[in-house]
């Protein structure tokens, strides 16, 4: 039992079972034992690889996509670039590099990051740029935003609800035989009737992210008032159903209750939930990541880059292209959705 397991065990014995969202927040963000406090999760030597770390092509194409979408709005106000959960800063660095000669593209960057360790990596990778770190979106000054959220929403804590014979119960984390274990609340819950809960049958699990609505509402408020675009890329689907709570360690899935603080905890993103929180803006169709990248010309870009590569470098380059776009890899699992001002021209590719 590691130190955070002991702490959680003590807290549950004292306060009773905790929600999955409480468990996720403690495991990921505990100031001493949290995953993002102590780990270096990204890359082959970490626990997972995000699309920007797979190949520079991802950030280059996304950067040009955002620049074109912003240009189409013909907005003369000065915009800022915002990234939520920027990891090592690789995506923002690639975006800024590929757009450096585009006059009306933002020069000021705001990064929403809670990990002090990751902030240091971002500072190193974005040296020379105008970067400011924020704790919430309210710290962004008035004006248009070009916002990117790549694998951000999947890491936000979820709550789970189980449909029983007598109604809805919350799925909780307690202790069984001295170990962390899943259970359900004794009392049934008075759940508001929504599409999620109305059509469920006995045994169904519904996941809810409490923090999604305020974040998406704030983003859409800024875009509706000032202009800009938000591009959300994550793994998930429309009208998500079932239990998707998962833990990743060294690129493998393990029991989410094992090794708390040492594993990445996530759940799939329900894009319909994100869309319902959008106010006074347009949203794009949900598009597969692979489809978007192919429409943006990743195969052509891959061919150009391959001309100077040989042996292992060429093999790795081909594998990266496949990983980003192939239906059996990231191409279909990851989805893309954009938020834009009402009546805006839908960006090419979506």
Where are these regions (language model features)?
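Conserved RecA-like P-loop NTPase ATPase core
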Residues: 58, 147, 234
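A mobile, often basic/glycine-rich helix-loop segment
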Residues: 146-197, 245-256
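Conserved protein kinase catalytic core
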Residues: 119, 156-157, 240
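Short, glycine/acidic-enriched loop or turn micro-motifs at the edges of active sites
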Residues: 116, 153, 237
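A short SAM/SAH-binding and catalytic strip from SAM-dependent methyltransferases
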Residues: 135, 142-165, 206-210, 214, ...
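Long, Lys/Arg- and hydrophobic-enriched amphipathic alpha-helices
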Residues: 192-350
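Rossmann-like AdoMet
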Residues: 1-84, 88-136, 140-144, 161, ...
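Short glycine-enriched loops at secondary-structure junctions
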Residues: 28-33, 188, 234-238
